[in-house]
Amino acid sequence: MSWFEKILPSIKQVTERKKNVPEGLWTKCPKCESTLYRAEVRRNLEVCPKCDHHMRLGGRDRLEAFFDEGTGVEISAEVTPVDALKFKDIKPYKTRIAQAQKATGEKDSFITMTGKIQGLEVVAGAFEFKFMGGSMGSVMGEKFVRAVNEAIERRCPLIVFSASGGARMQEALFSLMQMAKTSAALGHLRANKLPFISVLTDPTMGGVSASFAMLGDLNIAEPKALIGFAGPRVIEQTVREKLPEGFQRSEFLLEHGAIDRIIHRHNLSDELASICRMLLQKSA
């Protein structure tokens, strides 16, 4: 028997063990490239336990973690997208919607809830980036306006977590109209002297960054979030120059006065509760 035949059984055993490892058990950090136990990363709110890199967090998971346990209640869940333009690119818009709904379990890219943070009542919304890149369409705009109205009715702050590539191409002008619609709604919130806190997460781009996302009484970002209008590659190709290191990242924007603060994901609930109480002049 040759040496290769002697070690062949052990090679087969290792291969069989690898086959028995369930899919999705492990993941890799895109920053430090550490191999991580998936359940541990989920418990840590998609923050790498090795290098503290903030990975993308789903909209529903974000809101459920943000609110005090058991206080979050979804609102406007009945609003669903329609294909008013009968739009078709590579595939029909209806097909894209159905595929995104099946993949994410969400009806559209924006989720709104009422709840409490550290005992303080708030209305909050969050984007699901996995739903067509968190794109802003007519459903998002309608749910945003309803969230504003809910905050006015309850006399409480509005907090929105943005994670979007921008306006939804398949809805054309209906999508672009949401930039004006959401911005106008914030005017009503401001007239009622209620705070709007905008939390910019990775990525916040396009029509979302060019409208309500930058209109917060405080504009707060997570660490290393990509924030801007056009992407850095598009800008480099247009101006034909190399962009500065960290351009469009939250630290760069804070240094240049475009945002107010950077807050670690684990501290958002405590910090925002404190900020909202101060703005509302309420004691803990």
Swiss-Prot record:
Superkingdom, taxonomy of origin: Bacteria
EC number: 2.1.3.15
Subunit structure: Acetyl-CoA carboxylase is a heterohexamer composed of biotin carboxyl carrier protein (AccB), biotin carboxylase (AccC) and two subunits each of ACCase subunit alpha (AccA) and ACCase subunit beta (AccD).
Organism (species): Hydrogenovibrio crunogenus (strain DSM 25203 / XCL-2) (Thiomicrospira crunogena)
All copies of domain CoA carboxyltransferase N-terminal, residue ranges: 25-284
Protein name: Acetyl-coenzyme A carboxylase carboxyl transferase subunit beta
The keyword Zinc is assigned to this record: yes
Cofactor(s) needed for function: Zn(2+)
Pathway noted in the entry: Lipid metabolism; malonyl-CoA biosynthesis; malonyl-CoA from acetyl-CoA: step 1/1
Single GO MF annotation: acetyl-CoA carboxylase activity
